[in-house]
């Protein structure tokens, strides 16, 4: 059950990252927002490669004490990530204000929170 919760959370994050390309999320990132959109898009995509490789390696590694700690860290990140997006939206950036974008972000956070509870208890 715990693995399924984590897989849904991470899959929701991956879907959000696809949506983030459409929303030009690189404009929110300190270094990339200084680049022209075409270059920033390429960097945004390329910089996600090691993150996705790490997530897939984590999943492929199977259960262990170390992977559970890392999963917990990913869970915390997803919860904080949702809060950051809410904070950005509250400041007036409406890029992720669509109900679908918000749903993806909060779906990841919700399943991460449930999974984190599963890990802790």
Residue ranges with predicted function:
Residues 33-51, 101:
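A loop-to-helix transmembrane entry motif
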Residues 49-81:
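Short alpha-helical packing/oligomerization segments
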Residues 39, 98-113:
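Small-residue-rich segments of transmembrane alpha-helices in multi-pass membrane proteins
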Residues 43-57, 106-112:
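Core segments of transmembrane alpha-helices
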Residues 7-24:
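N-terminal signal-anchor/start-transfer transmembrane helix
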Residues 113-121:
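Juxtamembrane boundary at the C-terminal end of a transmembrane helix
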Residues 64-68, 83-100, 120-121:
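Membrane-helix boundary connector in multi-pass membrane proteins
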Residues 20-38, 88:
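Cytosolic, membrane-interface loops and tails of multi-pass inner-membrane proteins
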